[in-house]
Design a protein with these regions (language model features):
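Conserved pre-motif I regulatory segment
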Residues: 1-26
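Motif I (Walker A/P-loop) of helicase-class P-loop NTPases
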Residues: 4, 27-38, 139
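Conserved catalytic network of the ASCE P-loop NTPase/AAA+ motor domain
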Residues: 10-13, 40-45, 69-73, 91-95, ...
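Conserved SF1/SF2 helicase motif Ia
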Residues: 17-21, 31-62, 74-75, 148-152
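Conserved beta-strand segments of the P-loop GTPase G domain that flank and frequently precede/overlap
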Residues: 21, 51-54, 80-81, 101, ...
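Conserved nucleotide-binding/hydrolysis micro-motifs of P-loop NTPases
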Residues: 26, 55-59, 84-86, 106-108, ...
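Conserved nucleic-acid-binding Ia/Ib motif block in the N-terminal RecA-like helicase ATPase lobe
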Residues: 44-102, 106, 121
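Post-DEXD/H (motif II) to motif III coupling segment of the RecA-like Helicase ATP-binding lobe
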Residues: 118-182
Length: 182
């Protein structure tokens, strides 16, 4: 039997977007492997993965996990969050990065105000999608998703059966498969 992580990777590599149903403590340890699968080495220039988090603290903890896990392949992982200096964060992104981790609102603001290039994006991850929707991030996520090139999308949620959630996800994640922790 395949593990939750292996099942998600298999579907993503086949070009299908994935809705992962699990708690953060179940998927956070797997995020570095998802990133490494699509951003295997450092390159100059544009981001190749975006990770959208609900809160500043979530973004900081995911950033820390990714920094440790990708140290050996020397990926540049930039952290952008609401309480940080927008000017410093913008300058960091202009210097080039492989992965951007941050709050949904700040990533969206920086993207639309400063236009970092998403042309090479390979992986778009939204964490705690159900909570992000209930906290008013729906519009930010939709605007980012509409701007993306064809890339793999990975959405994590705990409550996938809510009708408003299902309808919203189908707007921009297609085709998709659902993978649940057993």
């Amino acid at each position: 039997m395949e593990s939750y992580e292996q099942e998600i990777l298999k579907k993503l590599k086949s070009g299908i977007s994935v809705i992962g149903i699990s708690k953060p403590e179940e998927y956070i340890p797997a995020i570095p492997n998802f990133i490494k699968a699509f951003v295997p080495q450092a390159e100059e220039g544009s981001p190749r993965a975006l990770v959208l988090c609900l809160t500043d603290d979530d973004a900081k903890s995911i950033h820390e996990v990714l920094e440790k896990a990708t140290k050996e392949i020397d990926l540049t992982i930039d952290l952008v969050f609401n309480k940080g200096s927008k000017l410093k964060q913008r300058n960091d992104l202009f210097d080039g990065t492989e992965v951007i981790v941050g709050t949904t609102k700040r990533i969206c603001e920086l993207y639309f105000q400063n236009g970092f290039n998403v042309g090479k994006l390979k992986l778009f991850i939204v964490l705690q999608m159900d909570e992000q929707i209930s906290k008013g991030m729906k519009g930010f996520i939709a605007r980012l998703a509409e701007s993306l090139p064809k890339c793999r999308q990975l959405i994590f949620t705990q409550h996938p059966k809510e009708e408003r959630f299902v309808d919203y996800i189908q707007q921009f994640v297609s085709p998709s498969a659902t993978v649940e922790v057993k």
